[in-house]
Structures are given as C-alpha cells and as structure tokens.
C-alpha cells in the first residue's frame, strides 16, 4: 500500500486551466485535527469569486473525521483533490501539496482559518495591475467559534498599496514590518519550482525559516491594504505553548533566514548582523519571561550558547560601526546580568 493516496473528481488539470487565459491558482491546505473548523475553511475556498482553482486538501494522517470530510468535499466540487498521507507535520504536508500542485500560482491556507471570498480575485488582479509575482494582504483575528475579535491594535496596518523590491520587502520582513506567514500572500509557482524550495520538516517556526526565500526570488512585491484572511485564535497554539524546544526552533529559523539572505544578497550582511542581535536579545528576554509564566526550566547550555551568540553579534555590529537601538541596548544590559546569574553557578560547580 502506498504511503500516499489521492482522491479527486475526474476533471483534469488541463481542463481546470481552460485555454490558459486565466491562470490556475493552486490552494494548498494541510489538514490535521480540525474537524470542527474544516468545513468553514473549505467553504470559503470553493466560494471564491476567482473560479480557476485547484484546491489540494492534504490529510496529514488526521486521527479524527477529517479524512472522510475531505473525501466528501471531492463530490461537492470538482476542483478539490485530496491527498492522504502518514502524519509528518505541517511542513511535510505543505511539501507534499507543493509537489502535487499544477497551478501557475500558489497559495497556502491553514485549515482552521477562514478567508474572504474575494481573496484570490484581489490577489490576481493586483498581480496583473502591478506586474507583480507576489501579493501580500492584511489579516484579522477571529475567536474559536469564528466571531471577529475587536481590538484597537492592528498588526502591521497600512492604508495604501505598497510596491516593493525584493530587498525592500526582505528588510521589512526581518524588521517585523511584514508578517511572516505563508497564508498572508499569493506567489507565482515559478518562485517555488525554479529554486528547489521546501519547508524544513520536523520543526516549528517554519514560516520564518523560509519566507525570505520566496520574497528574495520574486521580482516585485505588492502589499494591498485589505484584511482578506481571518486567523483563528485557538487554545494550544504554538504561541501559547512555549518551551526550550520552541526557543531552539526560533534560533534555527532565524539562522536559516540569515543564511539565505546573506548568500543571496551579500550587501545585506551588516544589516543582518544588527537585526540578528536585536532578534536574539528579544528572544532571550521572551524565553526567560515565558519560563516564569509556564514554569519550565531553561537549559544552562542553551543559555550559554545564546549569551555567546549575543556577544559575537555585539562585536560584529560595533565593528561595522552600526548603532544599536537604545531599547535593545537597555534590554541587552539587563540580559547580560541575567545570563551571568544563570551560567556562572554551573561553571563554579564544575570547577
């Protein structure tokens, strides 16, 4: 028996593509343990005003009713294909979906979230109007039962269309001025296919690890000021379950990002050193804060590695003549004292 199986209607990719005048968009939806939310997500996709879609539901070995629910959708809409596979995690499911996708453009959706019905239409119109190959949009948040969450805080809010070069967009993303989620943009499939793209399997924070790889291979990025995606706030999400392993995944993700950026755009080397310093200082602070809230122990070896990393980055930034932001310097001074208190007792014990 094959590790993967696929369910679909009899319609072919060529039929979905029509005469080629309207680009085919592949929507990739990893599915695992979301039977409560899956139908609402898929309904938003099949109801898109942009009709030329293939919707890939990748069942990642879900233990609930999701596999049967996915199969049932193929009888309701001929554009839906279902891939059943053994559980491998979000990145693995995305990679499988990407390998199976036949569209001219790629869009990833999380199966517990919801989308506006004009999301693809707005993205594709923007691609055409601005000769772009990557279009980003805003998002808002909904509760577990799908109700809008109102807040005066709007993350990375903007009111006008923003046109960016890849380098401009990368710098904005690294500075957290652009959201680092794969569901926050539609991109040309060639960006993925022509550069050997894949998500890192077996890790969290996979979006940060790879988003700049996509941005960097585009030729024009356009951001539109519309909230087209609805992110569902659920208990037990990654952000609500901090651990030392999650901290390690954050470190690996930002290292992956830096490696790609510096190799692809060497002129950003000094910029990345400063941004890495800012990132690690803030990550450290948040790890210690979360350890107090969640009551988990910080591994002294991890603490020592991060301390040494910050020391090295501090020297690199000073050597380049760059100025550390005042807020980061203040936090850095506090963290140095905290590290000394955490690491020195263990060193003394070994002596």
Where are these regions (language model features)?
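Membrane-interface aromatic/basic loop that binds lipid-linked glycans or pyrophosphate carriers
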Residues: 1-12, 16-17, 132, 292-351
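N-proximal low-complexity "stem/linker" segments adjacent to membrane-targeting elements
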Residues: 1-46
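Acidic helix N-cap motif at the loop->helix transition within catalytic regions
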Residues: 39, 53, 64-72, 84, ...
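A conserved acidic beta->alpha catalytic loop
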Residues: 44, 51, 59-68, 86, ...
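Glycine-rich, basic loop-to-helix element that forms the pyrophosphate-binding segment
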Residues: 85-101, 114
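Short aromatic/hydrophobic "clamp" motif used to bind/position activated sugar donors
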Residues: 106
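Donor-binding/catalytic cores of nucleotide-activated saccharide
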Residues: 111-222, 233-242
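Catalytic core of nucleotide-sugar-dependent glycosyltransferases
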Residues: 227-234, 241-268, 283-318
């Amino acid at each position: 028996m094959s590790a993967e199986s696929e369910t679909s209607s009899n319609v072919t990719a060529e039929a979905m593509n029509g005469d080629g005048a309207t680009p085919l968009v592949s929507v990739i939806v990893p599915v695992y343990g979301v039977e409560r939310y899956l139908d609402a997500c898929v309904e938003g996709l099949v109801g898109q005003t942009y009709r030329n879609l293939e919707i890939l539901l990748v069942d990642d070995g879900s233990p609930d009713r999701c596999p049967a629910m996915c199969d049932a959708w193929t009888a309701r809409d001929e554009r839906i294909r279902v891939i059943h596979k053994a559980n491998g995690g979000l990145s693995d499911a995305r990679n499988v979906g990407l390998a199976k996708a036949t569209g001219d453009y790629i869009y990833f959706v999380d199966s517990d979230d919801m989308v506006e019905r004009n999301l693809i239409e707005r993205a594709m119109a923007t691609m055409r109007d601005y000769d772009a190959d990557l279009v980003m949009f805003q998002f808002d948040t909904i509760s577990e039962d799908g109700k809008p969450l109102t807040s005066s805080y709007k993350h990375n809010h903007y009111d006008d269309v923003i046109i960016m070069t890849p380098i401009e967009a990368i710098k904005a993303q690294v500075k957290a001025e652009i959201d680092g989620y794969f569901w926050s943009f539609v991109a040309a499939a060639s960006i993925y296919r022509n550069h050997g793209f894949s998500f890192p399997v077996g890790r969290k924070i996979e979006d940060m690890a790879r988003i700049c790889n996509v941005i960097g291979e585009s030729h024009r990025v356009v951001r539109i000021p519309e909230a087209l995606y609805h992110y569902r706030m659920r208990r037990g999400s990654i952000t609500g379950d901090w651990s030392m392993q999650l901290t390690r995944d954050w470190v690996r993700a930002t290292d992956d990002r830096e490696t790609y950026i510096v190799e692809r755009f060497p002129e950003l080397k000094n910029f990345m050193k400063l941004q890495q310093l800012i990132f690690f200082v803030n990550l450290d602070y948040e790890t210690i804060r979360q350890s107090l809230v969640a009551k988990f122990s910080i591994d002294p070896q991890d603490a020592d590695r991060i301390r040494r990393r910050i020391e090295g980055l501090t020297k690199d930034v000073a050597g380049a003549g760059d100025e550390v932001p005042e807020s980061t310097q203040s936090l850095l001074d506090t963290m140095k004292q905290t590290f000394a208190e955490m690491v020195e007792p263990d060193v003394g014990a070994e002596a």
